[in-house]
């Protein structure tokens, strides 16, 4: 008995601060994913507004939404129509007026809000505009358990390890990754998948914002750190890959038991400030 899941990873350019245009483009990608029987679709970091803190930081407050705001309502109808889970990274309002999160919403196949994740490791100029998250939820879907992190989070092994220990069999990392760091992009997700014996995918923007060029090149790796599929560089693309999450449980139990054989009593240094 297998637990196959078909995952669609969206590599798209965004129109700065134009939610309507970006959501219409997202709809097209969702329709394409439905034609390929996708169970889940994930968009890149801040896909509905554009990313650049330098260019649009002061306007984040104007485009921020509640988790169940207009973007959710638009995507929820598509989730129901196509029976597809949707991971949508957007600017989220916090519980404190004026404080924002670089976050995401997760929508179920029947159009319900499953929850949110807020980026915990803020990069550079993000710190001036966003509050860092402080929790690492996992999402129980009908095919398995999914963990989420955003861009810079992927460089911290602790994040994916916590997600794996919480049961994640598939970890998704929507990003806005610049071309100058492509060597890191090519290393991040294979490392995280091998360390945690699970599937890991990077979902990147494509396009230019000011002097920041984002190159796409979505990737998905298996539980041994092997690259299963990748999208081209420099173009919009929908990468679709089917994975069997039963392979994760088998691999963790019988092949390389990294999670079971941790020596947590020796790891005190990990909780100390550097």
Regions found by a protein language model. Give the residues of each.
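Extreme N-terminal starter segment of soluble prokaryotic enzymes
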Residues: 2-9
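Conserved beta-strand and immediately adjacent loop positions that scaffold enzyme active sites
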Residues: 6, 87, 103, 135, ...
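Short, glycine-anchored, charge-dense loop/turn motifs used at functional sites
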Residues: 7, 106-114, 221-228
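Cys-nucleophile CN-hydrolase/nitrilase-fold catalytic domain and related Cys-dependent amidase chemistry
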Residues: 19, 28-110, 178-195
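Short beta->alpha transition motifs characteristic of CBS
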Residues: 49, 105, 116-123, 219, ...
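Active-site catalytic loop in hydrolytic enzyme cores
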Residues: 65-67, 77, 95-169, 174, ...
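CN hydrolase (nitrilase-like) catalytic-core segments centered on the catalytic cysteine
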Residues: 67-87, 155-239
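C-terminal beta-strand edge segments of enzyme domains
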Residues: 138-140, 205-274
């Amino acid at each position: 008995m297998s637990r196959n899941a078909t995952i669609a990873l969206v590599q798209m350019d965004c129109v700065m601060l134009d939610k309507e245009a970006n959501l219409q483009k997202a709809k097209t990608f969702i329709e394409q994913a439905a034609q390929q029987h996708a169970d889940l679709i994930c968009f890149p970091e801040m896909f509905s507004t554009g990313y650049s803190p330098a260019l649009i930081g002061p306007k984040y407050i104007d485009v921020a939404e509640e988790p169940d705001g207009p973007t959710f309502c638009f995507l929820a109808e598509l989730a129901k129509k196509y029976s597809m889970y949707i991971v949508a990274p957007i600017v989220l309002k916090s519980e404190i007026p004026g404080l924002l999160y670089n976050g995401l919403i997760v929508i179920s196949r029947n159009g319900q809000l499953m929850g949110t994740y807020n980026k915990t490791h803020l990069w550079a100029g993000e710190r001036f505009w966003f509050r860092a998250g402080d929790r690492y939820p996992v999402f129980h879907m009908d095919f398995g358990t999914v963990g989420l992190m955003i861009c810079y989070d992927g460089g911290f092994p602790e994040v994916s390890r916590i997600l794996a220990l919480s049961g994640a069999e598939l970890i998704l990392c929507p990003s806005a990754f610049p071309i100058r760091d492509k060597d890191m992009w090519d290393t991040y997700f294979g490392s995280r998948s091998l360390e945690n014996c699970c599937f890991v995918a990077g979902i990147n923007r494509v396009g230019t914002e000011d002097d920041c060029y984002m190159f796409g090149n979505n990737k998905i790796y298996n539980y041994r750190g092997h690259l299963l599929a990748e999208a081209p560089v420099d173009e919009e693309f929908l990468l679709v890959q089917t994975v069997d999450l039963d392979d994760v449980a088998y691999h963790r139990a019988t092949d390389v038991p990294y999670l079971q054989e941790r020596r947590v009593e020796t790891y005190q240094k990990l909780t100390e400030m550097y």
